[in-house]
């Protein structure tokens, strides 16, 4: 990238960061979340098995922890916490399609969780799915106005895709 483009990119970043207070006055889009239809007994079981899975993970008993997470998903198929943890296991096992699917479901079921969204955006970038990464990062910039990482990642992707008009707008 030549010096002129670098200067324009720096000016654009500075402008967007300095306008961060304007973004906070925008209304947040309404996100329809599936209400948990678990009975108190089912919720208690889910919590128990999830915490037990985390305990086993900490003890490095990964196979047992993964089995308990699968049981958690049998109890509550849309539980974002279990979906996220399962996605991490799939990624470790290099089963990226299954990991990506689980992570996408986790983000869909917990859209206000910054870390789930950040993980999915990073995965999209690693998989060279830049359009999906841009779409998610654009949503994150609106949803998490106090976080600057999504904004910088978005500007980087715009630069790589040579979408200079998007950087300025």
Give the predicted meaning of each segment.
Residues 71-72, 105-106, 139-140:
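Canonical positions in the second alpha-helix
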Residues 42-75, 92:
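Alpha-helical segment of the N-proximal tetratricopeptide repeat
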Residues 58-59, 92-93, 126, 160-161:
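Register position in tetratricopeptide repeats
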